[in-house]
Design a protein with these regions (language model features):
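Short loop/turn hinge sites at secondary-structure boundaries
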Residues: 76, 104-105
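Glycine-rich short-loop/terminal segments
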Residues: 1-55
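Short, hydrophobic/aromatic-rich beta-strand segments within well-structured domains
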Residues: 83, 98-100, 109
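A sequence-level detector for short glycine-anchored, His/Arg-bearing signature motifs
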Residues: 87-103
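Short alpha-helix boundary/capping and kink motifs at helix termini
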Residues: 37-89
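Short hydrophobic/aromatic-enriched beta-strand-loop microsegments
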Residues: 106-113
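Beta-hairpin (beta-strand-turn-beta-strand) motif
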Residues: 87, 113-115
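Amphipathic, charge-rich alpha-helical segments that serve as recognition/docking helices
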Residues: 115-153
Length: 153
């Protein structure tokens, strides 16, 4: 039975955020500190349910239709870095990013994944229905990160 695992998609592929988190937890990549303003272009993406953009929420925070997103922003734990691709597109962490803006933070900790690393997180083409099960994700991670895993044996 397929499981519901979050993913990010671009115009070609779906990328597993679960694999990204596993990579972060195991490999402890370096964090980078960026200016919050460097990521503002991300506010215009339809990244949330019902085609809601972060900029819509920021511009109309009293609107009841944004209640769920505002709750998620309020509850977001900003101690965790957000995840970016090499173009600074947010892959995971929109709510944490918006919380930084609301709290007038000037900098944000991020992980930046280059194109080579991003290939390891691909789980399918953009418009394919994902039928992967938990064991499939474990197998993918083991296969794609075998060299790293060998260091821990």
């Amino acid at each position: 039975m397929p499981i519901n695992i979050d993913y990010f998609s671009d115009d070609k592929y779906q990328y597993s955020t679960a694999l990204m988190f596993a990579y972060i937890n195991l490999c402890k990549p370096n964090k980078t500190k960026l200016n919050v303003d460097d990521l503002k272009f991300n506010l215009d993406y339809n990244c949330w349910a019902n085609n809601v953009r972060p900029i819509d929420v920021l511009n109309d925070m009293k609107n009841k239709k944004y209640k769920d997103e505002l709750t998620r922003i309020k509850n977001a734990n900003i101690k965790y870095p957000i995840i970016l691709d090499s173009n600074y597109k947010i892959l995971d962490g929109y709510h944490r990013y918006v919380k930084h803006i609301i709290e007038n933070k000037k900098t944000i900790n991020v992980y930046i994944f280059d194109k080579k690393l991003m290939k390891k997180f691909i789980i399918g083409k953009r418009h394919e229905i994902n039928t992967l099960e938990i064991n499939d994700f474990i197998e993918l991670f083991n296969r794609r990160f075998k060299k790293i895993l060998l260091k821990y044996e």
